[in-house]
């Protein structure tokens, strides 16, 4: 595009922004309508309307896609490692769950600290630290032969690295969009589907032939290439804030933010249960039982169909609002989890996997869109998102080990854990309803 034409286009976009802001995502406060009391005085005068498209915006979205691919995509592949580690290490499923749960916990827990650093203008440093930690974790895991070694490498080191990478995938991408914010975040979060399909397929093909060590190294090479691209290409749009607290406690004075955070705590207690346990369930409970390879196919399907849930949910979230869609989605997830109790044949297992994959993908994608909707101050958006991640981290740390402990206590029967997680979804839905009722439009 010629320079003059590009300038005219930008000018038109800015002139029309105030009119367009009225039709933004329902239930969200338009960025341009924020008063000086709601936006930091240090940066308010420098913030221009989100471009809602363009090269930099979509490049940032692609970077967010790669970040989710190498963080949540790898985490969502843990089901295949859960199965392998249970056999290889001869440990109970609840013990193995701690490896994945610690990784997920740290991915969320460090969010509050990372969010403030991003707001302060240190995006490149945050991305570099995250990349280094993830690569150290994956390559040291490839050399691990003991349970405690995998806890340190795949659990702690990869988890810390993920924590540096997950928050910017949401907070930075969201600043480039207004009307299409939910769609852009949805495209970014679809990276977790890409990663799950890629890493599950790699592990499925390489574990029997190349062995565990080279399987992990091959995954590490893919992560290195894509994460280095992100470190170079991803840029923040907003000027750095010159001041601010590490934790914005004022956020919890907003009832909608507080109720949303509590609700997603209960939802995240339950949402990964299906991702971790559908494979062992298919080998232990249904009749006839599935083979190891067939059970891994369920994981591929579970993650693959998630792309439909993510894209459809975020497309309509821009029309109806993320909270409005999140409420029925979490309620349907509760019904799906309770219905899992009745799954007792391979056909039922495949049907349930497709259905839950779509619903679970929708929840994981609408969640960050919902946070962005509730965050009214652009200068502290990273901190608000990070704090939410930190609270939810404790749910992800304990959810699957609790489920594993219930299964072990019931001599390998799953219905107790399924009922517990279905109930957790119901409680979470109730708090999201409360958040919607208290949301200030």
From Swiss-Prot:
Region: Disordered, residue numbers:
1-47
The protein's location, in the record's own words, is: Membrane
Q: What is its main location?
A: membrane
Q: Which GO terms describe its molecular function?
A: transmembrane transporter activity
User: What's the source species for this entry?
Assistant: Gibberella zeae (strain ATCC MYA-4620 / CBS 123657 / FGSC 9075 / NRRL 31084 / PH-1)
InterPro entries from the xrefs? MFS (IPR011701), MFS_trans_sf (IPR036259), Proton-linked_MCT (IPR050327)
Q: Which UniProt keywords apply?
A: Glycoprotein, Membrane, Transmembrane, Transmembrane helix, Transport
Q: What induces it?
A: Highly expressed under trichothecene-producing conditions.
Give the record's membrane topology. Answer: Multi-pass membrane protein
Q: State the family named in the UniProt similarity comment for this chain.
A: Belongs to the major facilitator superfamily. Monocarboxylate porter (TC 2.A.1.13) family.
Bilayer-crossing residues are 61-81, 95-115, 125-145, 150-170, 183-203, 212-232, 259-279, 289-309, 323-343, 351-371, 389-409, 415-435
Free-text function comment from the UniProt entry: MFS-type transporter; part of the gene cluster that mediates the biosynthesis of butenolide, a mycotoxin that shows antibiotic activity but does not seem to play a major role in the spread of head blight in wheat.
- In which domain of life is the source organism classified? Eukaryota
GO CC terms in record: membrane
Q: What is this protein called?
A: MFS-type transporter
**Glycosylation sites (chain numbering):** 388
**Tagged with keyword Phosphoprotein:** no
Keyword Heme tagged: no
In terms of Pfam families, this protein maps to:
MFS_1 (PF07690)
């Amino acid at each position: 595009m010629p320079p003059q034409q590009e300038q005219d286009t930008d000018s038109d976009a800015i002139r029309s922004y105030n009119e367009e802001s009225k039709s933004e995502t329902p239930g969200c406060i338009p960025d341009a309508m924020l008063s000086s009391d709601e936006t930091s005085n240090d940066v308010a005068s420098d913030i221009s309307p989100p471009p809602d498209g363009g090269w930099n915006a979509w490049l940032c979205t692609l970077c967010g896609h790669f970040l989710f691919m190498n963080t949540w995509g790898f985490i969502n592949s843990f089901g295949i490692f859960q199965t392998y580690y249970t056999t290889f290490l001869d440990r109970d499923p609840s013990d193995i769950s701690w490896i994945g749960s610690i990784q997920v916990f740290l991915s969320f827990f460090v969010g509050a600290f990372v969010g403030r650093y991003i707001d302060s203008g240190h995006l490149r440093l945050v991305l570099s630290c995250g990349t280094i930690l993830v690569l150290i974790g994956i390559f040291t895991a490839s050399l691990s032969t003991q349970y405690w070694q995998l806890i340190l490498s795949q659990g702690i080191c990869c988890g810390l690295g993920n924590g540096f990478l997950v928050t910017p995938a949401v907070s930075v991408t969201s600043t480039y969009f207004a009307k299409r914010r939910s769609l852009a975040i949805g495209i970014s979060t679809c990276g977790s589907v890409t990663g799950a399909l890629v890493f599950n397929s790699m592990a499925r093909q390489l574990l029997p032939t190349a062995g565990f060590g080279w399987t992990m190294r091959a995954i590490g090479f893919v992560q290195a290439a894509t994460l280095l691209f992100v470190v170079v290409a991803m840029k923040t749009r907003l000027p750095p804030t010159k001041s601010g607290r590490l934790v914005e406690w004022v956020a919890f004075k907003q009832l909608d933010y507080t109720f949303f955070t509590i609700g997603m705590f209960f939802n995240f207690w339950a949402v990964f249960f299906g991702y971790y346990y559908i494979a062992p369930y298919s080998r232990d409970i249904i009749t006839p039982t599935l083979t190891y390879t067939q059970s891994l196919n369920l994981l591929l399907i579970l993650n693959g169909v998630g792309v439909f849930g993510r894209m459809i949910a975020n497309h309509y979230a821009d029309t109806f609002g993320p909270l409005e869609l999140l409420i029925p989605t979490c309620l349907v997830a509760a019904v799906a989890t309770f219905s899992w109790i009745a799954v007792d044949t391979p056909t039922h297992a495949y049907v349930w996997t497709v259905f839950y994959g779509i619903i679970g993908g929708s929840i994981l994608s609408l969640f960050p869109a919902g946070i962005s909707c509730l965050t009214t101050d652009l200068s502290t958006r990273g901190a608000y998102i990070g704090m939410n991640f930190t609270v939810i981290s404790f749910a992800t740390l304990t959810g699957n080990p609790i489920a594993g402990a219930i299964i072990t206590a019931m001599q390998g029967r799953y219905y107790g854990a399924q009922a517990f997680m279905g109930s957790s979804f119901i409680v979470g839905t109730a708090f999201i309803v409360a958040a919607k009722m208290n949301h200030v439009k």
